[in-house]
């Protein structure tokens, strides 16, 4: 059994990790930490886990994380980097669901996240945990940087075009929408029911923290610089990301065949039939990115529609997928749920 610890188990990604890991046949949950809620039974906070998780929250110091095989950080940005080195030195593998190790340019990371990086030497070692790109590197990793939610949907949507070299790379555009759970489990005015319901708005138009992460990936796929515009929006949904992506193609190519071939062996990427429009509810609760590709009115403009559940393929599900790869398990272990309808 894989001994698992979770640091920061009281947020939405933390409880989603617990939901998935509680029924994982190869996992033994050893510790779930929260300084504020130490001593509280996990099931008292999250009744959906009654009968599934018998642990209580503990402080990180009391959790015995160094005895785990792998520790997940479902914490705010800046927490994992303070504790990762000690865990790695103890032989523990680390999967960080925050952004501490995603961006390879440490100065760029510090600019966007407004803090000094505590272990910049580990950034180079960290493997970016997008399995559809880095599966082989994940297998040998000690430290995995789990991708962000927007970056997962956008990168998987653009990947086939850029790998094949058929898209003009100077004007890539991502128009993306997220449910309010993407903002985390905290009290902030803009995600209150009375503010978010019956409303739809753009935010961070001048610059979002996921922009450098996405751009970094797109430039790797393209093999050179890209021009990339990213505009996120907040929608009155709880879960879900819908990314509408725009690119001009420089060649006459069968786009449907291109996408189907690229993802034919990927269990968690579903390329829909030509003309389809994926819906966020079709991936609710599922570790799936559902994609459709269109060429608009016979022009050179390609429109890619990409949907994920921000808490599953955009966070906890992808983290479990990475763990499965890391420990040589079937990739879909504990991740076979279909989307919930209605």
Swiss-Prot record:
Cell compartments where the protein resides: Cytoplasm
Enzyme Commission identifier(s): 1.2.1.38
Superkingdom, taxonomy of origin: Bacteria
Record keywords: Amino-acid biosynthesis, Arginine biosynthesis, Cytoplasm, NADP, Oxidoreductase
PANTHER family tied to this protein: N-ACETYL-GAMMA-GLUTAMYL-PHOSPHATE REDUCTASE, CHLOROPLASTIC-RELATED, N-ACETYL-GAMMA-GLUTAMYL-PHOSPHATE REDUCTASE, CHLOROPLASTIC-RELATED-RELATED
NCBIfam families, A to Z: argC
Protein name (database record): N-acetyl-gamma-glutamyl-phosphate reductase
């Amino acid at each position: 059994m894989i001994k698992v610890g979770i640091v920061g188990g009281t947020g939405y990604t933390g409880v989603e990790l617990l939901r998935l890991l509680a029924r994982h046949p190869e996992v033994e949950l050893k510790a779930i930490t929260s300084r504020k809620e130490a001593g509280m039974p996990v099931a008292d906070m999250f009744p959906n886990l009654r009968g599934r998780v018998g642990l209580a929250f503990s402080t990180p110091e009391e959790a015995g994380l160094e005895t785990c095989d792998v520790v997940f950080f479902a914490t705010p940005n800046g927490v994992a980097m303070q504790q990762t080195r000690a865990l790695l030195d103890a032989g523990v593998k680390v999967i960080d669901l925050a952004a501490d190790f995603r961006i390879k340019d440490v100065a760029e990371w510090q600019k966007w996240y407004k803090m000094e990086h505590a272990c910049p030497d580990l950034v180079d070692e960290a493997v970016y945990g997008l399995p559809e790109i880095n599966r082989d590197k994940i297998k040998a990793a000690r430290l995995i940087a789990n991708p962000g939610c927007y970056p997962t949907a956008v990168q998987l949507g653009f990947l086939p075009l850029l790998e094949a070299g058929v898209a003009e790379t100077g004007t890539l555009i991502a128009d993306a929408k997220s449910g309010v759970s993407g903002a985390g489990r905290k009290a902030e005015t803009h995600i209150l029911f009375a503010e978010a319901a019956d409303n739809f708005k753009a935010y961070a138009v001048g610059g979002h923290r996921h922009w450098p992460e996405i751009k970094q990936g797109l430039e790797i796929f393209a093999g050179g610089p890209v021009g990339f515009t990213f505009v996120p929006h907040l929608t009155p949904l709880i879960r879900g990301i819908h990314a509408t992506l725009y690119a001009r193609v420089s060649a006459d190519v069968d786009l449907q065949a291109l996408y189907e071939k690229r993802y034919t062996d990927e269990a968690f990427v579903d390329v829909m039939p030509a003309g389809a429009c994926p819906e966020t509810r079709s991936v609710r609760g599922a570790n799936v990115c559902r994609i459709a590709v269109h060429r608009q009115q016979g022009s050179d403009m390609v429109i890619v529609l990409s949907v994920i559940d921000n808490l599953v393929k955009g966070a906890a599900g992808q983290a479990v997928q990475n763990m499965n790869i890391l420990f040589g398990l079937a990739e879909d272990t504990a991740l076979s749920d279909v989307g919930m309808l209605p």
